[in-house]
């Protein structure tokens, strides 16, 4: 057996239906495109969201909001993420990056109070919610906003 002798199993691959090859094929004459109209013509298709000339839905809806170009996006760390660190250790942005909790280089790191903290830590982050600060201090640790 050679590579050029390999063939797929019988019936495992269907033949492509060739259109426009006579009326008895079932796909002759109009080749499955229907009668006249834009979709029967050659030369491309309509753009996404095109409704035949009717005002499309995305233009009927009112504009809303804007994107602030000066917005700062922070990497989010929750309290339950900090349980992987040893009791009494110091958690900085560098230790968060080396542990894989912070992947992207953003404006900084923000600590949020989702979950429960079970270890005593010294946390140094750019921002922290009030609830997160209280939870870290309740566990015996401190939060330092840098």
From Swiss-Prot:
Biased segments, Gly residues type: 23-35
Swiss-Prot/TrEMBL GO biological process terms: translation
Biased composition (Basic and acidic residues): 1-13
Region (Disordered) residue spans: 1-54
Any single Gene Ontology cellular-component annotation: cytosolic large ribosomal subunit
Keyword S-adenosyl-L-methionine: no
Matches recorded under InterPro entries: Ribosomal_uL15, Ribosomal_uL15/eL18, Ribosomal_uL15/eL18_sf, Ribosomal_uL15_bac-type, Ribosomal_uL15_CS
Pfam families: Ribosomal_L27A (PF00828)
Sorted UniProt keywords: Ribonucleoprotein, Ribosomal protein, RNA-binding, rRNA-binding
Coiled coil: none
Annotated GO MF terms: rRNA binding; structural constituent of ribosome
Oligomeric and partner information: Part of the 50S ribosomal subunit.
NCBIfam families documented for this protein: rplO_bact (TIGR01071)
Function: Binds to the 23S rRNA.
Stated family: Belongs to the universal ribosomal protein uL15 family.
Name by which UniProt lists this protein: Large ribosomal subunit protein uL15
Organism (species): Lactobacillus johnsonii (strain CNCM I-12250 / La1 / NCC 533)
Underlying gene: rplO
């Amino acid at each position: 057996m050679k590579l050029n002798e390999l063939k797929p199993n019988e019936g495992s691959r269907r033949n492509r239906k060739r259109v426009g090859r006579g009326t008895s094929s079932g796909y002759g004459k109009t080749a499955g495109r229907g009668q006249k109209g834009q979709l029967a013509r050659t030369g491309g298709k309509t753009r996404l969201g095109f409704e035949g000339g009717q005002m499309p839905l995305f233009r009927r809806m009112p504009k809303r909001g804007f994107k602030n170009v000066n917005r700062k996006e922070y990497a989010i760390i929750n309290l339950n993420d900090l349980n992987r660190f040893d009791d009494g250790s110091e958690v900085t942005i560098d230790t968060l990056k080396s542990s894989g909790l912070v992947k992207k280089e953003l404006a900084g790191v923000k600590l949020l109070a989702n979950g429960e903290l079970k270890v005593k830590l010294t946390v140094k982050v750019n921002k922290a919610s009030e609830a997160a600060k209280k939870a870290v201090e309740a566990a015996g640790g401190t939060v330092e906003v840098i």
